């Protein structure tokens, strides 16, 4: 029997993200028709100074696979977060920003706000020049929005979703 691995001290502030999240979202962009999707996100850890991240979406209407991405989330310094992502479409993202805990009378909210510092792409990938992500976690509800600049369009809203701890 394998004992659970203790959480690395550098990711304690990110610990509320750990687990499986399921929910629904919507997407839009000037170059594609609006769409709805279901989603599952898993944040895990192996005792190192990062969390693992795996995301999968399916079309809400017929369940066909849509998008997936995988990567790592790190907090190299207090209130700082780095998110490194790879997409099977040939895109990679390095995002950096802030990690804050907002305390209210109704409980704590964990907020992550990151912007891309680098976007890489393979020769066959569509052009994506910038990405921003905002994640808020309050209790067992995780909400996010994604902004994207792609195919000559400026940075603008692309995705939003509400997920609940499974």
UniProtKB/Swiss-Prot annotation:
InterPro entries: Calycin, Nb(III)_bact/plant, Nitrobindin, PeroxynitIsom, THAP4-like_heme-bd. The keyword Glycoprotein does not apply. This is Peroxynitrite isomerase 1. GO terms for molecular function: heme binding; metal ion binding; peroxynitrite isomerase activity. Heme b binds at residue 158. Binds 1 heme b group per subunit, that coordinates a highly solvent-exposed Fe(III) atom. Belongs to the nitrobindin family. A motif (GXWXGXG) lies at residues 19-25. Its cofactor is heme b. HAMAP family: nitrobindin (MF_01297). Homodimer. Gene3D superfamilies: 2.40.128.20. Keywords: Heme, Iron, Isomerase, Metal-binding. Heme-binding protein able to scavenge peroxynitrite and to protect free L-tyrosine against peroxynitrite-mediated nitration, by acting as a peroxynitrite isomerase that converts peroxynitrite to nitrate. Therefore, this protein likely plays a role in peroxynitrite sensing and in the detoxification of reactive nitrogen and oxygen species (RNS and ROS, respectively). Is able to bind nitric oxide (NO) in vitro, but may act as a sensor of peroxynitrite levels in vivo. Pathway: Nitrogen metabolism. Its EC number is 5.99.-.-. It catalyses: peroxynitrite = nitrate. Forms a 10-stranded antiparallel beta-barrel structure able to accommodate a hydrophobic ligand in its interior. In fact, this fold hosts the heme group, which is located in a wide surface cleft.
């Amino acid at each position: 029997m394998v004992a659970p691995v203790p959480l690395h001290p550098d990711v304690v502030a990110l610990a509320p993200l750990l687990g499986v999240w399921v929910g629904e979202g919507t997407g839009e962009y000037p170059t594609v028709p609006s769409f709805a999707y279901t989603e599952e996100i898993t944040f895990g850890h192996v005792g190192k100074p990062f969390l693992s991240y795996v995301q999968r979406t399916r079309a809400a209407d017929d369940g066909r696979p849509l998008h997936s991405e995988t990567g790592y989330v790190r907090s190299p310094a207090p209130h700082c977060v780095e998110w490194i992502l790879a997409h099977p479409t040939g895109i990679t993202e390095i995002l950096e920003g802030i990690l804050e805990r907002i305390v209210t009378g109704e409980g704590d909210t964990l907020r992550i706000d990151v912007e891309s510092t680098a976007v890489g792409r393979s020769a066959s990938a569509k052009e994506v020049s910038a990405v921003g992500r905002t994640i808020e976690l309050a209790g067992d509800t995780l909400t996010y929005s994604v902004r994207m600049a792609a195919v000559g369009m400026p940075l603008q809203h692309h995705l939003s979703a509400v997920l609940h701890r499974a």
